[in-house]
From Swiss-Prot:
Modified residues (N6-(pyridoxal phosphate)lysine): K110
Family that this chain belongs to: Belongs to the TrpB family.
Assembly: Tetramer of two alpha and two beta chains.
Enzyme class: lyase
Protein name: Tryptophan synthase beta chain 2
Claim: Manganese is one of the keywords in the record: no
Domain of life from the UniProt record: Archaea
Cofactor: pyridoxal 5'-phosphate
A GO MF term: tryptophan synthase activity
EC number: 4.2.1.20
GN (gene name): trpB2
Single biological process term from Gene Ontology: L-tryptophan biosynthetic process
Length: 442
């Protein structure tokens, strides 16, 4: 069972949650003064239109016609499936649906914002985009967006993933991007971390610092971000807006689930449904799933913190493990992040979104069952959502209740096979830090 929308149903507007939040979002702070950040200072880092969108209180932002046309070419609208084989394997009365973002040409949801960011940069006359990537899905998406729109792209990829997922590098190079393992010797912050540990596995926080440092050396370059900030999450809401139309062919969901690193794929599916809850028009539950190795939602603190490891970004009020926290090298490289989207942090604080955390072995076990029943090998990041959906379906089975579960399968795992090999061979390690030293000063 699946629902497929025609191209005419590609959303014409992105949904901006800012005007609907239960409390005003705390302003980002200038890292030099600790005063609210002046938007003008962000223009040296981001494309101008993206800064405007970040600050906008308009509930909807029009999607440019050119972006919608490319959305059609790269696989939007994406299909929504019912996981009937998984339901039977679990013996659950719950009905499980998933939105499959792996159907895009780059294999994940990341292309939704990559195209938007590249479009606005090109329109401004920017020549080069620089970014970070964890597992490589975001770097892949931006590399293709740059190729399609005539922009050079440079990617700093967390070293652990650079080594675990070598074919991600190949795809990015095919799309014309430069790619470097992070930490690298190309930046001051990279050299600092390499001096501390020549084999440093890196992480998203370090890669972000390197990308920003790189951008600040070139007037014709701008930084593109794959998650966390509101304009990124807003671009992803095409997922949930499509899913709302597709679920009309089936039934209303009771619970909506997604994995979380910075929060963009979760927000992409959930925020259009959250809007209906905040307006009092519907009742849904929302479950955000993170790894126990990077538990910013379940064990972090809600404080102002840098978005990167080097302290280059504005300080944002968010759930954080501390910007100097070293995230262990789990195979879900896209979830190896110390912080969280500020908008999602607010929703968690108000009890609208419930966070849960899992070890990577139990996540891979859920992914294994999903692959055997539904035929799709999920990205390790997306497998966290599968684990959350399975646990919820088994809870419904124990309690003898029917329930409709919708989750975001945010990407495929065809280039993540080293993690699956380690899982099958019993070599996968679980990480659950007892203490977070980076929080000692918070």
């Amino acid at each position: 069972m699946k629902a497929v929308l025609p191209d005419s149903k590609i959303p014409k507007r992105w949904y901006n949650i800012l005007p609907d939040l239960p409390e005003p979002l705390a302003p980002p702070l200038d890292p030099e003064t600790d005063e609210p950040m002046e938007p003008e200072k962000l223009l040296r880092i981001f494309a101008e239109e993206l800064v405007k969108q970040e600050m906008s209180t308009d509930r909807y932002i029009e999607i440019p016609k050119e972006v919608r046309e490319i959305y059609s070419k790269i696989g939007r609208p994406t299909p929504l499936f019912r996981a009937t084989n998984l339901e039977r394997a679990l013996g659950t009365p719950a009905r499980i649906y998933f939105k499959y973002e792996g159907a895009t040409v780059t294999g994940s949801h990341k292309i939704n914002t990559a195209l938007a960011q590249a479009y606005y940069a090109k329109r401004q006359g920017i020549e080069r985009l620089v970014t970070e990537t964890g597992a490589g899905q975001w770097g892949t998406a931006l590399s293709l967006a740059g190729a399609l729109l005539g922009l050079n792209v440079r990617v700093y990829m967390a070293r652990a993933s650079y080594q675990q997922k070598p074919y991600r590098k190949t795809i990015m190079r095919l799309y014309g991007a430069e790619i470097y393992p992070s930490p690298s010797d190309r930046t001051e912050i990279g050299r600092k971390f390499l001096a501390e540990d020549p084999n440093h596995p890196g992480g998203l926080g370090i890669a972000i610092s390197e990308a920003i440092e790189d951008v600040l050396r070139d007037e014709k370059a701008r930084y593109a971000l794959g998650s966390v900030l509101n304009h990124v999450l807003m671009h992803q809401t095409v997922i949930g807006l499509e899913a709302q139309e597709q679920m009309k062919e089936f039934e209303e969901p009771d619970v909506i689930i997604g994995c979380v690193g910075g929060g963009s794929n979760f927000a992409g599916l959930a925020y259009p449904f959250v809007r209906d809850v905040l307006k009092g028009e519907a009742e849904y539950e929302f479950i955000a799933v993170e790894p126990k190795a990077a538990p910013s939602m379940t064990r972090g603190v809600y404080k102002y913190d840098y978005g990167d490891s080097g302290g280059y970004t504005p300080k944002m009020k968010m759930h954080t493990l501390g910007h100097t926290y070293y995230v262990p090298p789990i195979h879900a490289g896209g979830l190896r992040y110390h912080g969280l989207a500020p908008t999602l942090s607010v929703l968690i604080n108000h009890g609208i979104v419930k966070p849960v955390a899992y070890h990577q072995n139990e996540v891979f076990q859920a992914a294994h069952l999903f692959a055997k029943t539904e035929g799709i090998v999920p990205a390790p990041e997306s497998a966290h959502a599968i684990k959350g959906a399975i646990d919820r379906a088994l809870e419904a089975k124990r309690e003898g209740r029917e329930e409709v579960i919708l989750f975001n399968l945010s990407g495929h795992g065809f280039l993540d096979l080293k993690g699956y090999e380690d899982y099958l061979d019993g070599k996968l390690e679980d990480y659950e830090p007892e203490h977070f030293p980076a929080l000692d000063n918070y």
